[in-house]
């Protein structure tokens, strides 16, 4: 089940802990960098029916109305909405907080494990979009309701994801604009990092789960790992590399207070798991190992919210990059 990791994140027993005032980093309280704004695209397709046949990612031929607005999307809602489309309903786990304009008139499915056929049917869709790793047996169930097209889900290649969506709906102009935005965002972010003097530095993202730990990055988990290490080309120190590559240990394995210093990077960020609180909890601040870190003594720990980084979709990219740079600026 490809949404399991995402669901685990939201179902984790997060302890809401009181904390003192802390230097935090959200997109609302730090200096804005010269990063591009997310373009607002509209759906300019005709209302006339336009039948089209394509071969899907799983090799099936599907005939559908390429101009339909009657769509139910079981995955990748952020990419779909970014393109200018407004489905009837989308995956209920999609993050809409702060993106209400995109979700106006769009309902969220209540049943997402992986779906309730009756609920999907209730929307009377002409087309169903789903993630490309859905089991064929589930796709077969959906095909009894409407044509089904799997779309790219489990990849950071936004060009592949967005161009494929643009091809499905003949919205190449919109997909080209969106891809250009993503390219510009990456390029300007790299340039901004160099201006801050952090090129080739090491970065460590700490969090708390039954102990101070480092969030996993296997199977593309958490977008901040991709941005920091793959796009911005920052590095992990040797101990962080060993920790993240150790598949034998459980995710979020606690790091002992005595060894925590060994994981400190040139840049250090704390990933808050509390959706409503971007501060470092007391259970972390009172940890002797944490208090011994140079970055903590110098009050140079940036904070991000881990929930923002649970989805790869283009809709969230601008805020994800801004949040990371706000956190990095705290460490200056």
What label would you give each PLM region?
Residues 138-213, 311-332:
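Extracytoplasmic substrate-binding proteins
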Residues 20-73, 176-206, 274-280, 326-332:
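Bacterial Sec-exported substrate-binding components of ABC uptake systems
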Residues 46, 264-332:
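Structured C-terminal subdomain patch of bacterial secreted/periplasmic proteins
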Residues 117, 124-130, 147, 257-260, ...:
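Proline-aspartate-enriched helix->loop->beta-strand connector
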Residues 69-123, 127:
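A short, structured surface patch at a secondary-structure boundary
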Residues 70-83, 179-239:
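Basic- and aromatic-lined ligand-binding clefts that recognize polyanionic substrates
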Residues 1-9:
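Bacterial N-terminal signal peptides that target proteins for export
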